Amino acid sequence: MLMRFYEENIPLEMKAKKQWVCYRKRLIDGKVKKVMINPCNMSFAKSNDPSSWSTFLTAMKVLRNPKYKMDGLAYVLANDYVFI
């Protein structure tokens, strides 16, 4: 089930960055984990590989499309992170 969040509360500075992924919750070793998915090609995303990240708009389109069965959206922190 998709958790409710308020898109308007996400800072524009974050929305402008191409650092977004979707995730699916999976039971791994008895614990629920968030598995990051590249919204552009549905492959696994990597926290250390910017080529596997996407724009906010692309990630939102995938999140809202029930055929992809995503559980949420995640912002990947990069070396240039300056938000407080």
Question: Language-model segments: which ranges?
Answer:
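Conserved phosphate/metal-binding and DNA-contacting active-site motifs used
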Residues: 1-84
